[in-house]
């Protein structure tokens, strides 16, 4: 990759110092960008634990498909998921917004570039730090739909029969008998814990510096049976063999696990569990007297169908994903003379994604018939990927008066 000094870049660029945002507890590093950089839109697409943010550097309007920026971690362009990176591993982030991006990275940077510099040790210093965060998340009452209670819903049904000139079923002749009833929407939610622990160790000597970060993040979802966990580590080491020869290694393994039932989707769909729960009459109880959950519930006075118990369905459905990833980098840099820098590097991105989805017969669709004993569905997939990038560069820079002459030669090979 060719290099340019910050003052030589004529385009728009912003640098975000993560040390100043160390007290902001987030699951994904992109969340720290919210409200920090002018002209960069950072939006949350879903409330599922562990899900990343949508980042738009040049806005959403484009004639081309896709609008995600290019992420470059320690000089290595990342093509896949970038949400596995622990925010506590990052030292700084620089956003290239316009022509500066394409001049360095070509067409891959059509929607901007996010340059990520991970933490490294400073010479002459040894530091050990530990930080922890614990919190509780809830869906605020202001953000919840206003649901009818049992009496209100039964009164509504009674009046609907009367308006149609039909006889009112016995079940709805005395609406007050149902009292408050049961809030199915609230039954699908919970108070969710969030925990974040990180240990950092860095040491710096004259010819050797190293930095190690170990992190554990655990976030329960406010929706039942949803959670996200991530275990990450990063080791950055630099060896100065001589005054003009430097060797560097970066190693970053990550393991993440998430479980999320199909909570999104339209009304009446098998995926919209939460939406379907809002349609369930509040006069029905989602729990038996002995504490167990019935498979289906039936509305009294209505001869039509049985409805699945959504509170049970969301706990019975299994939809989990396990991801393993290793980012590795090794580089050798040589400066034979002042202004001339020769560098060769090998970068690797290796990982796997395992998905397991099981929908038992106890989970069904809105207004569907009672589930069949053989109506279960199972889906499994295991995808592996790898990407190698070998890059050799030669950069020569010389200041002549008020001008700077820069010449760059780049050769790279990518295999994936």
Where do the PLM segments sit?
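An active-site-proximal structural segment forming one wall of the substrate-binding cleft
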Residues: 340
């Amino acid at each position: 990759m060719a290099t340019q000094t910050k003052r030589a870049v004529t385009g728009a660029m912003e640098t975000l110092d993560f040390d100043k945002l160390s007290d902001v507890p987030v699951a994904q590093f992109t969340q720290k960008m919210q409200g920090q950089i002018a002209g960069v839109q950072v939006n949350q697409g879903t409330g599922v634990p562990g899900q990343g943010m949508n980042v738009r550097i040049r806005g959403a309007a484009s004639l081309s498909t896709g609008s995600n920026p290019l992420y470059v971690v320690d000089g290595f362009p990342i093509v896949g998921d970038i949400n596995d990176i622990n925010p506590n591993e990052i030292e700084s982030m620089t956003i290239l917004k316009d022509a500066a991006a394409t001049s360095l990275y070509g067409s891959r940077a059509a929607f901007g570039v996010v340059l990520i510099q991970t933490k490294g040790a400073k010479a002459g210093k040894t530091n050990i730090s530990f930080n922890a965060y614990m919190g509780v998340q809830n869906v605020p009452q202001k953000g919840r739909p206003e649901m009818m209670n049992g009496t209100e819903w039964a009164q509504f049904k009674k009046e609907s029969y009367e308006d149609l000139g039909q006889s009112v079923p016995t079940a709805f002749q005395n609406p007050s008998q149902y009292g408050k009833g049961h809030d199915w929407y609230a039954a699908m939610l919970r108070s969710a814990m969030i925990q974040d622990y990180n240990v950092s160790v860095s040491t710096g000597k004259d010819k050797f510096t190293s930095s190690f970060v170990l992190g554990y993040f655990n976030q329960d979802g406010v929706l039942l049976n949803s959670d996200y966990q991530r275990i990450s580590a990063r080791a950055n080491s630099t060896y100065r063999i001589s005054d003009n020869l430097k060797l560097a290694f970066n190693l970053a393994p990550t393991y993440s696990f998430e479980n999320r039932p199909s909570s999104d989707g339209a009304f009446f769909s098998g995926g919209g569990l939460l939406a379907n729960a809002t349609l369930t009459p509040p006069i029905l109880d989602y729990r038996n007297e002995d504490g167990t959950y019935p498979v289906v519930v039936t509305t009294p006075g209505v001869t039509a169908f049985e409805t699945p118990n959504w509170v049970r369905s969301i706990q019975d459905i299994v939809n989990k994903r396990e991801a393993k990833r290793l980012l590795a980098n090794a580089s050798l840099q040589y400066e034979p003379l002042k202004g001339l820098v020769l560098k060769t590097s090998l970068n690797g991105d290796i990982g796997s994604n395992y998905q397991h989805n099981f929908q038992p017969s106890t989970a069904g669709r809105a207004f569907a018939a009672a589930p069949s004993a053989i109506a279960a569905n199972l889906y499994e997939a295991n995808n592996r990927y790898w990407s190698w990038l070998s890059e050799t560069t030669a950069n020569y820079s010389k200041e002549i008066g008020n001008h700077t002459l820069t010449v760059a030669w780049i050769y790279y090979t990518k295999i994936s």
